A protein has these predicted regions:
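N-terminal "arm"/small-domain region of PLP-dependent enzymes with the aminotransferase-like
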Residues: 1-57, 144-145, 150
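Conserved core of the PLP fold type I
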Residues: 55-160
Length: 160
């Protein structure tokens, strides 16, 4: 299959996800936003046959009910809410939408490890900005840069 790939991906470093422990009996895995617990009994009761039937169908591609609910909850307009199939898809859309002519993305040196991968995929330059000694971000490091700035809040994996 790789012989059909675009040459622009030849030097792309594959993404390596964080540690995926095998023995989960004594651990609660938190690094991939998975819930280690079963659904609450109230959730199980709320699922009825009609909803189970809907599980075989594609969801609304515009996510209208979800966007409406989130906009109402946060008191913002629908045009201020974006929904996607997980954070990686949303990030891909954001990289496409906000890539500047300079082609640079600035983000903390210690942050989400997929940012450099997206930079490679979209032909952008990844500029890693050092953190302060206490792992916090110095906003002045980003003043006047010629590209898109990514500030994750809270920053992963530092939590700051």
């Amino acid at each position: 299959m790789s012989r059909f790939l675009s040459s622009k991906y030849e030097d792309l470093e594959p993404y390596t996800p964080g540690e995926q422990p095998k023995n989960m009996k004594k651990l609660i895995k938190l690094n991939t936003n998975e819930n280690p617990y079963d659904p609450a009994p109230e959730v199980l009761l709320a699922i009825n046959n009609e909803e189970i039937e809907k599980l075989r169908l594609y969801s609304d591609p515009e996510a209208a009910p979800l966007i409406e609910a989130a906009a109402g909850f946060y008191g913002v307009g629908r045009d201020m809410v974006m929904a996607g199939n997980g954070s990686d898809e949303v990030l891909a859309f954001l990289f496409m939408a906000f890539q500047q002519k300079s082609g640079r993305f600035y983000f903390p040196e210690i942050s989400y490890s997929f940012y450099p991968v997206y930079c490679s995929v979209f032909g952008a330059e990844a500029v890693k900005v050092p953190l302060k000694e206490d792992f916090s971000i110095d906003p002045s490091d980003y003043y006047g840069v010629d590209g898109t700035i990514i500030i994750t809040n809270p920053n992963a994996p530092t939590g700051i």
